[in-house]
Design a protein with these regions (language model features):
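Alpha-helical transmembrane segments
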Residues: 55-78
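Transmembrane alpha-helix boundary/anchor motif
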Residues: 12, 70-73, 115
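N-terminal secretory/membrane targeting signals
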Residues: 1-22
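Non-transmembrane, membrane-proximal soluble domains of secreted or membrane proteins
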Residues: 18-55, 78-302
Length: 302
């Protein structure tokens, strides 16, 4: 048993000390390796989220050290001594101590809530000039200090694919439903969302049928997509690359295959992709008329 434990310790140590290039990983693609959930500067928001992540860990470790220290101290200092048969002093309650047990955790949660909501609001708030009529951010507020949007993209989640309306460029992309194509998880057939690097994008999120969630793991942010509700968020991609996206809300049989890719490219490449959609006749916008409730109503009428 001792040799087995030693072998396990050696294996873990070797894995921890292995060069980073033995574990190739691209943020959002494959398995990310390391303590940090993404990389700083990937978007204009990831640095703040990573700081929140690190700060939460530091605070949790500080509390843990304090609790563990006091626990160990009590175990050692007040342990039962040899030939000590006396019953310790019994206390039914200790009001100051119980108040401390209540107030301190509430204060800790309040501090965590303050910093979490501050970082989250930075994603969700958009400028009045770019927020579409009838939409709300998840906070229900508008931040006058938010960046002016360079690009507006409307996204529809549907069982089980995605529609992307590039409103600024007046073109659209409609993903094929996995249930119709039978090509589950085939990389070449996944919908691809193109974003220009270093340009602020305002996303408007809607559902065509059931509850979905729009999630780009490398961006460290997820937004629910709910029927009858429109949510928005704003982000500026700052590093070119290909990142995975997925639905993060259980939405039926092919939920696990409701994937997409995000390609952050230079402006020239982005314009070329928009031109390809335009040349394919995919101009305009795919609106609510393709939502399930409207399609079902039309079928009933016929």
């Amino acid at each position: 048993m001792r040799s087995l434990a030693l072998a396990g310790l050696v294996a873990i140590t070797a894995a921890a000390c292995a060069p980073a290039d033995q574990f190739p990983s691209e943020p959002g693609k494959g398995v990310d390796v390391g303590f940090l959930p993404s990389e700083r500067g990937l978007t204009d928001k990831t640095t703040g989220l990573i700081d929140l992540w690190n700060g939460s860990w530091v605070a949790a470790l500080a509390v843990g050290v304090l609790v563990w220290g006091l626990t160990i101290w009590c175990i050692v200092a007040y342990r039962k001594r040899k030939n000590d048969d006396q019953l310790p002093v019994q206390l039914r309650y200790h009001v100051p101590l119980e108040l401390m047990y209540t107030v301190v955790p509430v204060l800790m949660i309040g501090v965590l809530f303050f910093f979490s909501s501050k970082v989250t609001a930075d994603f969700q708030d958009v400028t009045p000039s770019t927020q579409a009529a009838g939409t709300t951010s998840a906070t229900g507020e508008i931040n006058d200090e938010a960046k002016a949007s360079d690009l507006e993209i409307e996204i529809y989640g549907k069982q089980w694919s995605w529609d992307f309306n590039y409103l600024t460029d007046d073109v659209y992309y409609s993903g094929d439903r996995i249930s119709l194509t039978g090509k589950e998880g085939v990389e070449e057939t996944l919908p691809t969302l193109y974003l220009p690097v270093d340009e602020t994008v305002t996303f408007t999120l809607k559902s065509r049928d059931v509850a979905h969630a729009f999630w780009i793991p490398a961006f460290l942010y997820k937004v629910d997509i709910l029927p009858g509700r429109t949510n928005t968020f704003q982000v500026t991609p700052q590093k070119e690359g290909v990142y995975s996206g997925k639905c993060a809300e259980l939405c039926g049989e092919f939920h696990a295959e409701m994937l997409f890719n995000v390609e952050v490219v230079d402006r020239a490449t982005y314009d070329a992709k928009m031109a390809e959609l335009r040349d394919a006749g995919q101009t305009g916008r795919l609106g609510d008329e393709l939502n399930r409730k409207y399609l079902v109503t039309q079928e009933d009428q016929h």
